[in-house]
C-alpha cells in the first residue's frame, strides 16, 4: 500500500484498501520519522487525495480520521452509509471528536432512504414479531420484589405497590428486567421451542417438499450465549425423532411436512475481535464446534484459519456459488453476535431471530440482512425474544429515523 501511494505512476488512480491496512502503513511511517527523521509521505503532503469510505457510520472513527488527516492534510472525504449516526443516536462524547456522521463528514450530498428503496422494489419490507418469554405475572412479581426493598417505597402498602405496578407503562416495566434473566437455560429453551415449533419453522425457513429453502440468523448478546444456543440445539436435535418428541402437542398442519433429517444445519461465526475476551476458553470450545462442522461438511478448517472457516460459513449461508446451491451443502441457521449483521448480502436469508437489544443503526443494519429480493420471498421476517414492548419502540424509533 505504501509503495502504491508513493508511486509516480499512480497519479489519478483509485486504490481500494482497508482502514486497518492504511493505519498500519501510517504507523510504519510514524516509526520511520521517529527513528530516522524520515518523512515517508512527505511528497503527498501537498497533493489532493480523496478518501471514499463505505459503511462510514462505523468503518472509521472520528479519532482515526483525524490521525489520517495529519498525514494527508489536503484530503477530501466522502462517506456512504445506509444508517448515518444522527443526533438521536449520537456516539458518546470523547473530547471534541465528532459524534454524528454529519459532524465527521459534513453536509449530506444525497439521500436514498428505506422508503425510496421500497418504492423502487429494490428491497422487501419487514414483518416483525415480538415474542415474550416472561409471563406477565412473573414480571409483576419481579417488579414487586424490587420495589418492596426500595427505601423510596417503604411507606407504600402491598396494595399501593401493586396499584403502581398495574399503572406502569409496559416499557417501564421492562426496565426492571436484568440481562441475567435472559441468560437462564429456561429462556434459551423457550426461544428454541418458538423457533423450531413445526408450523413456525415451516414458514421461517420456507419449507417445500419437506426441505428448507431459506436460511436464518440468530443474533445473541455474547459469544457465551451463542455457544450455549449451539449446544442446546445440538442436544435438542440429536434424536432423529426430535420434532415428534419436542413438539408432540404442536403437530404440523396437514399438507406441510418437515422431512429433512439433517435440519437444522447450524454454525457459529464470530470475528477475532469479538473473541478477545476470555480468548483461551472460547478457542477451546470453538475447536470442538469447528470439528463438528468439518465432520458434517467434509472440510478441514481449524482455529488457526478461523477466517477461512468464517468464509466457508458465508458461502454456505449465501448459496451464491454453484457448489453451495446443492441441497445439503447449505447452512440453515447461523448463530452470531455482531458478525454478518452489517454489509453481508445473502438473498436466501429470510429470517432474523433477535435475542438481544438492538436500536437505531444497529437495528436497521441487522434487520436488513433479511430484506434482499429473492424468488418466492415477500418479506424479511424478524422475531425478537427480549423486552417485546421496548423492542417494539426501538423498531418504531429506528424506522422513523431512517425512513
Short names for language-model regions:
Residues 90-213, 229-245:
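Interdomain helical connector at the RecA1-RecA2 junction of SF1/SF2 helicase-like NTPases
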Residues 174-333:
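Conserved C-terminal RecA-like helicase domain
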Residues 38-78:
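SF2 helicase catalytic motif II
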Residues 1-32:
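Inter-Walker segment of RecA-like/P-loop motor cores
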Residues 15-18, 76-81, 335-336:
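Structural recognition of the conserved hydrophobic beta-strand(s) that form the central parallel beta-sheet
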Residues 25-30, 56-67, 90, 344-347:
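Conserved ATPase-coupling elements of RecA-like P-loop NTPase cores
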Residues 369-398:
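Conserved segment of the helicase C-terminal RecA-like domain
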Amino acid at each position: 500500500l505504501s509503495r502504491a501511494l508513493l508511486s509516480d505512476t499512480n497519479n489519478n488512480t483509485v486504490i481500494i484498501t482497508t482502514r486497518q491496512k492504511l493505519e498500519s502503513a501510517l504507523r510504519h511511517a510514524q516509526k520511520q520519522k521517529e527513528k530516522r527523521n524520515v518523512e515517508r509521505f512527505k511528497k503527498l503532503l501537498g497533493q489532493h487525495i480523496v478518501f471514499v469510505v463505505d459503511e462510514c457510520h462505523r468503518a472509521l472513527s472520528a479519532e482515526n480520521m483525524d490521525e489520517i488527516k495529519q498525514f494527508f492534510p489536503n484530503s477530501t472525504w466522502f462517506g456512504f452509509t445506509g444508517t448515518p449516526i444522527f443526533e438521536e443516536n449520537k456516539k458518546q462524547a470523547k473530547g471534541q471528536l465528532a459524534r454524528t456522521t454529519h459532524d465527521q463528514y459534513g453536509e449530506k450530498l444525497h439521500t436514498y432512504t428505506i422508503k425510496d428503496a421500497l418504492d423502487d422494489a429494490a428491497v422487501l419490507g419487514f414483518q416483525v414479531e415480538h415474542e415474550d418469554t416472561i409471563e406477565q405475572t412473573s414480571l409483576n412479581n419481579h417488579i414487586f420484589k424490587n420495589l418492596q426493598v426500595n427505601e423510596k417505597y417503604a411507606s407504600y402498602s402491598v396494595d399501593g405497590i401493586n396499584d403502581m405496578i398495574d399503572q406502569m407503562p409496559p416499557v417501564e416495566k421492562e426496565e426492571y428486567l436484568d440481562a441475567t434473566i435472559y441468560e437462564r437455560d429456561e429462556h434459551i429453551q423457550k426461544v428454541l421451542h418458538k423457533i423450531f415449533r413445526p408450523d413456525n419453522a415451516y414458514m421461517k425457513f420456507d419449507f417445500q417438499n419437506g426441505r428448507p429453502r431459506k436460511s436464518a440468523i440468530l443474533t445473541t448478546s455474547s459469544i457465551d450465549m451463542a455457544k450455549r444456543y449451539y449446544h442446546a440445539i445440538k442436544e435438542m436435535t440429536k434424536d432423529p425423532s426430535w420434532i415428534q418428541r419436542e413438539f408432540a402437542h404442536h403437530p404440523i398442519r396437514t399438507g406441510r411436512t418437515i422431512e429433512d433429517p439433517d435440519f437444522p444445519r447450524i454454525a457459529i461465526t464470530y470475528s477475532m475481535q469479538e473473541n478477545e475476551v476470555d480468548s483461551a476458553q472460547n478457542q477451546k470450545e470453538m475447536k470442538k464446534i469447528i470439528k463438528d462442522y468439518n465432520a458434517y461438511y467434509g472440510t478441514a478448517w481449524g482455529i488457526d484459519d478461523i477466517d477461512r472457516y468464517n468464509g466457508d460459513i458465508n458461502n454456505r449461508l449465501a448459496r451464491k456459488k454453484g457448489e453451495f446451491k446443492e441441497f445439503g451443502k447449505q447452512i440453515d441457521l447461523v448463530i452470531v453476535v455482531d458478525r454478518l449483521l452489517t454489509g453481508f448480502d445473502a438473498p436466501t436469508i429470510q429470517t432474523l431471530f433477535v435475542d438481544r437489544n438492538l436500536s437505531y443503526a444497529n437495528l436497521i443494519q441487522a434487520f436488513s440482512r433479511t430484506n434482499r429480493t429473492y424468488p418466492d420471498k415477500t418479506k424479511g421476517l424478524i422475531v425478537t425474544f427480549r423486552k417485546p414492548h421496548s423492542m417494539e419502540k426501538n423498531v418504531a424509533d429506528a424506522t422513523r429515523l431512517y425512513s
